[in-house]
Design a protein with these regions (language model features):
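Hydrophobic transmembrane alpha-helices and their immediate loop junctions
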Residues: 1-196
């Protein structure tokens, strides 16, 4: 179930698309009794997205749409088709960079928020095209002489990450089940988006 809406009904504002999986992702947040945890999660995610927006503003990139899904928030830009590779990579990595900076700045003072920020950084650097790290890899692989071999290696890496996450759930308990489930869903989504 997907629904879309626009902010302010004007074409100059970005289109917002909300996927049902996003609602499934955030629903458990409202079940948490500790409001600080909810605020920490929203802060970490908000600053991550602010990092992308700040880099886009610095490069003069216009935002066309925002897609909220269970995998996170994807910002779709107005592309001319001739964007420099380095500019795209900087924009993609600016979100995880903000999370890493937040982790370094808050490490000892606010360890819970710092660890959430580090987790967001590492999650977003996973090699799935819906995430920042995977999008960077897609940019680097596309058009490469060894594109087919690199895509196969990337597919194997994704499967290995899922297997590792399953082993971690087995060894360390169900607290890691959401991460393993997210990696499994990303693997399935990746498979569907690259199938003929």
């Amino acid at each position: 179930m997907i629904f879309s809406f626009r902010i302010f009904k004007a074409d100059k504002f970005p289109k917002i698309r909300v996927d049902f999986t996003f609602l499934l992702l955030i629903a458990p947040l409202f079940l948490l009794r500790d409001r600080k945890n909810v605020l920490d999660i929203l802060l970490v995610c908000g600053l991550h997205e602010w990092g992308h927006l700040a880099a886009m503003a610095a490069f003069g990139v216009k935002l066309r749409a925002v897609h909220l899904s269970g995998f996170g928030i994807r910002m779709i830009t107005k592309k001319s088709g001739t964007e420099p590779l380095l500019k795209s990579i900087v924009i993609l990595l600016s979100g995880p960079a903000v999370n890493l900076l937040l982790f370094l700045l808050m490490g000892r003072k606010v360890p819970e928020t710092a660890m959430l920020s580090l987790g967001a950084c590492l999650y977003n650097l996973l090699p799935f095209s819906q995430l920042d790290g995977g999008a960077v890899l897609e940019l680097l692989i596309s058009g490469s002489v060894h594109e087919y071999a690199l895509r196969m290696a990337l597919r194997l890496l994704r499967m290995a990450l899922f297997a590792l996450s399953a082993v971690l759930v087995y060894c360390y308990g169900y607290a890691l089940l959401p991460l393993s489930g997210a990696i499994f869903a990303l693997c399935i989504s990746e498979r569907q988006s690259h199938s003929p």
